[in-house]
Amino acid sequence: VSQADIAAVQTSWRRCYCSWDNEDGLKFYQTLFDSNSKIRHAFESAGATNDTEMEKQANLFGLMMTQFIDNLDDTTALNYKISGLMATHKTRNVVDPALFAIALNELVKFIGNQQPAWKNVTAVILSQMKIALSSN
């Protein structure tokens, strides 16, 4: 991933994240759930069955994305964060890489700007997620 892509993603995420906890996070999750029943089912089976729980999950997702995006310049730290997330998802038996791809693609569409840079960055994140899911 180029430094220009990293800078574009970091800048656009910081703008989006300013209203993530108050508004955009829940909007994103509602859009995500409406777009894919498998994603909805995965979250509902983990307990996100109402707006309060969805908002809680959205806030956690925002924090996780912030950690990923803040570490785009540090491959070791980024891989560590991704591996930790995948380990947690393995304990919940959420191991289908397609679900993570859907979520990341929906995030790219939701953010709306800097899409080529976001696609490059999320491709790297998804690749590392697949590696982490396949490891023991």
UniProtKB/Swiss-Prot annotation:
Protein name (database record): Globin-2
Domain of life: Eukaryota
Keyword tRNA-binding included in the entry's annotation: no
Domain Globin: 1-134
Molecular function GO terms recorded: heme binding; metal ion binding; oxygen binding; oxygen carrier activity
Family: Belongs to the globin family.
Subunit organization: Homodimer.
Gene3D superfamilies, sorted: Globins (1.10.490.10)
Alphabetical UniProt keywords: Heme, Iron, Metal-binding, Oxygen transport, Transport
This protein's record includes keyword Hydrolase: no
